[in-house]
Amino acid sequence: MSRTVFCHYQQSDAEGLDFVPYPGELGQRIFVQIGKTAWQAWLAHQTMLINENRLSPRDPKHRAFLEAELQKFLFERNADKPEGYVAPVRD
């Protein structure tokens, strides 16, 4: 049975995540306050950040940057796209 959370990102009730997706207190906060749809939106945004900025998830500085962007994206709603980013054209 799925759980329902009030998603901070969507500002509405949403289906909750099935597991804690991130370590530590931030992971617990995400589990309690973020829905599946919002988490999928973050994963897509994170992929774009990694690709456009040529980040390595193994680099501690890059991980710190991604964690800061995660918080801005999900909880502050003010994450920016990389400079010069052009969204792909879909057919």
Curated annotation (Swiss-Prot):
Keywords: Iron. One of its GO terms (biological process) is cellular response to oxidative stress. This is Probable Fe(2+)-trafficking protein. It comes from the Bacteria. One of its GO terms (cellular component) is cytosol. One of its GO terms (molecular function) is iron ion binding. The lineage of its organism: Bacteria, Pseudomonadati, Pseudomonadota, Gammaproteobacteria, Lysobacterales. Could be a mediator in iron transactions between iron acquisition and iron-requiring processes, such as synthesis and/or repair of Fe-S clusters in biosynthetic enzymes.
